[in-house]
Regions:
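A short gly/proline-enriched turn/hairpin at secondary-structure junctions
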Residues: 36-44
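Acyl-donor (CoA/ACP) binding surface of acyl/acetyltransferases
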Residues: 2-19, 23-24, 30, 72-196
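A general structural signal for well-ordered secondary-structure junctions
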Residues: 36-37, 63, 159
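Active-site rim helix/loop that mediates acceptor-substrate recognition in acyltransferases
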Residues: 43-78
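Charged/polar, solvent-exposed surface patches and flexible loops
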Residues: 29, 38, 52-56, 182, ...
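Generic structural signal for well-ordered secondary structure
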Residues: 20, 29, 43-47
């Protein structure tokens, strides 16, 4: 999405940067992992296909993607590629419902899991979508056996609205309100820096 192509979102322990060509090779390595393919509902791509997808996503008006960097690694290495730990996306995939977005989060780097990097990243992404893209309802589709991700979204106030046995996924939604936005901002302010 061109809207976020020059946007950098600084959090306490993460930085969100637009998905660029320099990130593709490492992203492609992550996506060779069968578990990540399953959890994200992704098909394996060749490196060439991954580069083509990155270019398409940059042009698509309905996809907003950020690569998640570990802020502490980035500060010490000054390398976005070395600091990459995952990605977060907003898909505005229903034109008749232009103010609804599907939100996704993936922490691909196993060493970065369990450190609340996903929590901080998804809150930053949702705030961006609400404030910059005028999103007023968020939706998450999660594999039914991905208990950690389901728990994160429930903790964020999302409620289950559907379940698909065929796709083995649960759909959760959250209506945006000013009270909830204030709550999200308070959660961001309560995140403490850790350099681990």
């Amino acid at each position: 999405m061109r809207t976020n192509m020059n946007t950098r979102i600084n959090g306490t322990n993460v930085i969100l940067v637009p998905y660029q060509e320099k990130h593709v090779t490492k992203y492609h390595e992550w996506m060779k992992n069968p578990t990540l393919q399953y959890l994200t509902g992704s098909e394996p791509l060749t490196l060439e296909q991954e580069f083509e997808m990155q270019k398409r996503w940059l042009e698509d008006k309905d996809k907003c993607t950020f690569i998640i960097l570990d802020k502490h690694i980035f500060v010490s290495t000054e390398s976005e590629v070395d600091a990459m730990i995952g990605d977060t996306n907003l898909f505005l995939n229903e034109p008749q419902e232009s103010c609804i977005a599907e939100v996704e989060i993936m922490i691909a780097d196993e060493a970065s899991r369990g450190k609340k990097r996903g929590w901080e990243s998804v809150i930053l992404m949702m705030c961006y979508g609400i404030e910059m893209l005028n999103i007023n309802k968020l939706r998450a589709k999660i594999k039914t056996d991905n208990a950690i991700s389901i728990k994160i979204f429930e903790k964020l106030g999302f409620q289950e609205v559907g379940k698909s046995e065929v796709f083995q996924e649960v759909t959760l939604e959250k209506e945006v309100s000013s009270d909830w936005m204030n709550w999200l901002h308070s959660k961001l302010q309560s995140i403490t820096s850790d350099s681990n």
